[in-house]
């Protein structure tokens, strides 16, 4: 558009509306929902930062966002689309107009228009869950073999960032006042045992993320909450067991890949709570920590039983959108 929009219309698929309607928008000082997200992006976003588009917002920008939101009409509609992930934004200012459509996954811009002229037009995948990579090669046996044999130099940078970033936001969740403070409540009520710390750290990270904290998170399966749940319990158990860094990396490979393996058939957005998949993944990673020196078949049996047991208990949990209560669901999934 080239200038601030005088009005905006957002069309989104049902799962997008569900997931955004109640969650705080990072950096906005407590605003929530799709209109707030649209206003934040238009008034103060930095598109060069991709998924961290709102990461540089300060107090001055917060005031500008609130002013913009108060005086700019922003409407939200349910998209008439068969896709699970579909967002179309129209914006206008004076005689100028612009349209951008994102489909299938979070960074996939498929259409851009300016004043009716089409600047970008990509085909939309009819099967919205195809994604960028073929995950059909994944299996529990294959994941364990890879975790044991992988050259860690190929994954060390990503896993070290996962440890550093996700631990930082969990610690912030334990320090600050975010949502229902599930992580803090768990530690204060039940003590500092590793079983409590494992779920408290994951819950605290979600406390912060779901309630406006702008710290970055290394995601898994397109989800920050899943990234937190798949990693932080494993990190806590690795500390408790005195595992070295290489062992922690390999356990995180198990957790992350089991989570992705489970989510591959569920889809990026669904009515199935993704914390369940990630909690199951972290359980598999913890089982790896305890059984890493066992023979291959014995380790496979331990991890497989962990997956079956965890899914048998909590797989009925429903996703009703991202919000403060996600932290409690994460604690239940890890438990």
Residues covered by each model-derived region:
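Conserved phosphate/anionic-ligand binding catalytic regions in large, soluble enzymes, centered on
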Residues: 1, 215-232, 273-277
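Early transmembrane hairpin of solute transport permeases
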Residues: 1-80, 87, 91
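Alpha-helical support elements that line or immediately flank enzyme active sites
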Residues: 1-3, 42, 227-245, 284-293
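Acidic-glycine-rich active-site phosphate/pyrophosphate-binding loop
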Residues: 4-16, 193-212, 244-263, 307, ...
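Flexible, glycine/charged-enriched surface loops at secondary-structure junctions
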Residues: 5-7, 49-54, 75-78, 153-159, ...
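Glycine/charged-rich beta-loop-alpha catalytic/anionic-binding loops adjacent to active sites
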Residues: 16-24, 208-219, 259-269, 319-320
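Signature of multi-pass transmembrane helix bundles
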Residues: 69-212
């Amino acid at each position: 558009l080239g200038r601030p929009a005088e009005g905006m219309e957002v069309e989104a698929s049902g799962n997008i509306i569900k997931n955004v309607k109640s969650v705080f928008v990072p950096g906005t000082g407590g605003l929530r929902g799709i209109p707030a997200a649209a206003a934040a992006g238009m008034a103060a976003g930095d598109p060069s930062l991709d998924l961290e588009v709102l990461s540089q917002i300060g107090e001055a920008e917060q005031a500008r966002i609130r002013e913009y939101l108060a005086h700019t009409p922003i409407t939200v509609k349910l998209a008439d689309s068969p896709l699970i992930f579909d967002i179309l934004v129209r914006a206008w200012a004076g005689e100028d107009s612009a349209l951008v459509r994102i489909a299938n996954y979070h960074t996939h811009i498929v259409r851009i228009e300016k004043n009716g002229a089409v600047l970008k037009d990509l085909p939309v995948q009819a099967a919205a869950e195809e994604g960028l990579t073929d995950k059909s090669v994944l299996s529990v046996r294959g994941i364990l073999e890879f975790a044991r044999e992988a050259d860690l130099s190929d994954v060390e940078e990503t896993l070290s960032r996962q440890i550093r970033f996700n631990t930082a936001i969990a610690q912030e969740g334990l320090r600050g006042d975010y949502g229902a403070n599930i992580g803090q409540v768990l530690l204060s009520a039940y003590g500092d045992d590793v079983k409590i710390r494992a779920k408290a750290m994951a819950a605290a990270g979600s406390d912060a993320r779901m309630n406006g904290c702008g710290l970055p998170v290394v995601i898994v399966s397109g989800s920050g909450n899943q990234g937190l749940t798949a990693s932080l319990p494993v990190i806590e158990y690795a500390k408790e067991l005195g595992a070295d860094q290489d062992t922690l990396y390999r356990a995180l490979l198990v957790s992350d890949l089991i989570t992705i393996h489970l989510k591959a058939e569920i889809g990026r957005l669904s009515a199935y709570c993704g914390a369940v998949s990630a909690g199951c993944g972290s359980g598999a990673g913890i089982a790896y920590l305890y059984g890493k020196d066992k023979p291959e078949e014995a380790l496979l049996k331990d991890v497989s039983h962990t997956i079956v047991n965890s899914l048998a208990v909590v797989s009925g949990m429903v996703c009703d959108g991202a919000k403060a209560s996600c932290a409690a669901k994460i604690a239940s999934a890890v438990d």
